[in-house]
C-alpha cells in the first residue's frame, strides 16, 4: 500500500487531527461496548508520547446532519480516559470558534475529543467547505479507522485534500492482516460466508470464487443455493427471485475451480423462535412445513475437515440463526475448531462484520482468531475487492 504512516512524520508540537471510530453502542447515556475505543489505544498513546496535540474526530449513529443529544460523543470521554489512562478534553462542536479556542489551549500531549461530525450535514455530503473547516484546526491528519474508510465523507476522504495525511497504527495493522487474508494469502484459502440473504452479499460471492479455494455458504443464504440445485427447502428463508443469479455464481465457481460447500444436513425447526421443536434432517428430506435454522452434524464435520486442510480462513456471517438456541451450535462448533487451529499456528484466521464478531464472542473464541475486524461495511467492501475511498485518499494525499 502506497501511503505514509506515523513513521514518516515528526509530530512534536503539531496539531494532529485523528479520525477514530467511536461509533459505539450506548444506552441511557453510557457506553455498552468499548471494543472500538480500545482499537485506537496504540495510535493515541504513541502520538501523545511523541508530543503531538491530539484532536479526535468521530461520528456516532445516524443523526442526519443535525444535533441529536442521544448521539453525543460526550459519554465516550470517561471510558476513553480509563482505557488510555490520560485526561481527555471535550468540545461541544467539531468546527467553529469554540473548537479553535479549545485547540489553542492544548499542550503537547494533550487530547481533545470533538463532538459528532455527523451533527453537520457537510460530513456525509463530503462537502469541501466542511472538510476545510475541520482541517483548519490541524497541521496534519491521521486516519486510524478502517471501519469508516468505505465512506467518502468529509472527515475520511475530503479532509485529505487540505492536510498532509497519514495512516494510524490501527489502520495499518488492519490492512496488513487483511492482506494475509485475500491479498497474498497462504494457500489453500477457505472462505465462510453466512447470513440471511444472498442479495446483500452477491458482490462478495462473485469476488471470492476468483480468490479462494473453498467457499462455504451458510445461514439463510445457503437455502437459495440449495433451491437453485433443486432441493426442497420447505418454509425456509429463500430468495426465489435470485435463483438464476445464484446459478451463475455456482457456474462461476466451477470455472474458477473454487469448491463450493453447501449443507448436506440441517437442523430444521417448525417455529421461528428460541427452543422451537426441531430435528436433524438430511438435506434431501426437508419437510414442507419445516425451516432450515442451522447446519447439521455432517455439515459441521465437512466444513471442519476442509478447515483442517486450509492455511487461511476468511469468515463473514454466521452459519445458522445463532441468536436463538439451539440454532447457534453449528457456528459455535466451527468457530471453536478454527480457533483451536489458529492458536496452534496451523491457520491464519480473519473474521469481520458485526454479526460475525458477536457470534465469535458468543462462542467464546473471538480473542483466539488471528485477526478480528470490528468493521462491518468496510470489511464487506474489502471482501468484494473494492478500493475503499478513505484508503485511496491516503495513497493520493
UniProtKB/Swiss-Prot annotation:
<feature type="binding site">
    <location>
        <position position="323"/>
    </location>
    <ligand>
        <name>ATP</name>
    </ligand>
</feature>
<dbReference type="InterPro" id="IPR036043">
    <property type="entry name" value="Phosphoglycerate_kinase_sf"/>
</dbReference>
<dbReference type="GO" id="GO:0005524">
    <property type="term" value="F:ATP binding"/>
</dbReference>
<dbReference type="InterPro" id="IPR001576">
    <property type="entry name" value="Phosphoglycerate_kinase"/>
</dbReference>
<dbReference type="GO" id="GO:0006094">
    <property type="term" value="P:gluconeogenesis"/>
</dbReference>
<feature type="binding site">
    <location>
        <position position="36"/>
    </location>
    <ligand>
        <name>substrate</name>
    </ligand>
</feature>
<keyword id="KW-0418">Kinase</keyword>
<feature type="binding site">
    <location>
        <begin position="21"/>
        <end position="23"/>
    </location>
    <ligand>
        <name>substrate</name>
    </ligand>
</feature>
<dbReference type="InterPro" id="IPR015824">
    <property type="entry name" value="Phosphoglycerate_kinase_N"/>
</dbReference>
<feature type="binding site">
    <location>
        <position position="151"/>
    </location>
    <ligand>
        <name>substrate</name>
    </ligand>
</feature>
<feature type="binding site">
    <location>
        <position position="118"/>
    </location>
    <ligand>
        <name>substrate</name>
    </ligand>
</feature>
<dbReference type="Pfam" id="PF00162">
    <property type="entry name" value="PGK"/>
</dbReference>
<dbReference type="GO" id="GO:0004618">
    <property type="term" value="F:phosphoglycerate kinase activity"/>
</dbReference>
<dbReference type="GO" id="GO:0005829">
    <property type="term" value="C:cytosol"/>
</dbReference>
<feature type="binding site">
    <location>
        <begin position="353"/>
        <end position="356"/>
    </location>
    <ligand>
        <name>ATP</name>
    </ligand>
</feature>
<comment type="similarity">
    <text>Belongs to the phosphoglycerate kinase family.</text>
</comment>
<comment type="pathway">
    <text>Carbohydrate degradation; glycolysis; pyruvate from D-glyceraldehyde 3-phosphate: step 2/5.</text>
</comment>
<feature type="binding site">
    <location>
        <position position="201"/>
    </location>
    <ligand>
        <name>ATP</name>
    </ligand>
</feature>
<keyword id="KW-0547">Nucleotide-binding</keyword>
<keyword id="KW-0067">ATP-binding</keyword>
<keyword id="KW-0963">Cytoplasm</keyword>
<keyword id="KW-0808">Transferase</keyword>
<comment type="subunit">
    <text>Monomer.</text>
</comment>
<protein>
    <recommendedName>
        <fullName>Phosphoglycerate kinase</fullName>
        <ecNumber>2.7.2.3</ecNumber>
    </recommendedName>
</protein>
<keyword id="KW-0324">Glycolysis</keyword>
<feature type="binding site">
    <location>
        <begin position="59"/>
        <end position="62"/>
    </location>
    <ligand>
        <name>substrate</name>
    </ligand>
</feature>
<dbReference type="InterPro" id="IPR015911">
    <property type="entry name" value="Phosphoglycerate_kinase_CS"/>
</dbReference>
<dbReference type="GO" id="GO:0006096">
    <property type="term" value="P:glycolytic process"/>
</dbReference>
<dbReference type="GO" id="GO:0043531">
    <property type="term" value="F:ADP binding"/>
</dbReference>
Amino acid at each position: 500500500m502506497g501511503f505514509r504512516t506515523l513513521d514518516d512524520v515528526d509530530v512534536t508540537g503539531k496539531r494532529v487531527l485523528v479520525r477514530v471510530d467511536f461509533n459505539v453502542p450506548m444506552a441511557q447515556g453510557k457506553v455498552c461496548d468499548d471494543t472500538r475505543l480500545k482499537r485506537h489505544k496504540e495510535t493515541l498513546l504513541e502520538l501523545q508520547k511523541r508530543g503531538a496535540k491530539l484532536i479526535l474526530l468521530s461520528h456516532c449513529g445516524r443523526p442526519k446532519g443535525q444535533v441529536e443529544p442521544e448521539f453525543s460523543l460526550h459519554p465516550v470521554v470517561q471510558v476513553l480516559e480509563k482505557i488510555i489512562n490520560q485526561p481527555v478534553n471535550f468540545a461541544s462542536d467539531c468546527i467553529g470558534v469554540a473548537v479553535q479556542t479549545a485547540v489553542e489551549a492544548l499542550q503537547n500531549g494533550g487530547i481533545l475529543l470533538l463532538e459528532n461530525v455527523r451533527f453537520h450535514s457537510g460530513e456525509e455530503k463530503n462537502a469541501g467547505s466542511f472538510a476545510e473547516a475541520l482541517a483548519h484546526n490541524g497541521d496534519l491528519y491521521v486516519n486510524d479507522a478502517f471501519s469508516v474508510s468505505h465512506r467518502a465523507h468529509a472527515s475520511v476522504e475530503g479532509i485529505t485534500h487540505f492536510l498532509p495525511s497519514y495512516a494510524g497504527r490501527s489502520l495499518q495493522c488492519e490492512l496488513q492482516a487483511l492482506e494475509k487474508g485475500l491479498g497474498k494469502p497462504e494457500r489453500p484459502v477457505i472462505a465462510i460466508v453466512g447470513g440471511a440473504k444472498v442479495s446483500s452479499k452477491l458482490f462478495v460471492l462473485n469476488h471470492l470464487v476468483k480468490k479462494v479455494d473453498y467457499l462455504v455458504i451458510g445461514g439463510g443464504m445457503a437455502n437459495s443455493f440449495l433451491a437453485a440445485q433443486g432441493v426442497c427447502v420447505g418454509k425456509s428463508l429463500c430468495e426465489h427471485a435470485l435463483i438464476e443469479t445464484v446459478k451463475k455464481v455456482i457456474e462461476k465457481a466451477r470455472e474458477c475451480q473454487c469448491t463450493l460447500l453447501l449443507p448436506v444436513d440441517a437442523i430444521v425447526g417448525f417455529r421461528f423462535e428460541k427452543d422451537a421443536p426441531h430435528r436433524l434432517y438430511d438435506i434431501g428430506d426437508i419437510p414442507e412445513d419445516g425451516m432450515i435454522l442451522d447446519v447439521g452434524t455432517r455439515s459441521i464435520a465437512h466444513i471442519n475437515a476442509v478447515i483442517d486442510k486450509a492455511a487461511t480462513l476468511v469468515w463473514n456471517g454466521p452459519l445458522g440463526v445463532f441468536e436463538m438456541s439451539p440454532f447457534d451450535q453449528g457456528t459455535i462448533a466451527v468457530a471453536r475448531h478454527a480457533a483451536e487451529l489458529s492458536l496452534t499456528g496451523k491457520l491464519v484466521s480473519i473474521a469481520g462484520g458485526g454479526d460475525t464478531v458477536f457470534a465469535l464472542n458468543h462462542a467464546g473464541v473471538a480473542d483466539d482468531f488471528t485477526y478480528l475486524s470490528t468493521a462491518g461495511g468496510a470489511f464487506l467492501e474489502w471482501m468484494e475487492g473494492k478500493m475503499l475511498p478513505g484508503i485511496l485518499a491516503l495513497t493520493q494525499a
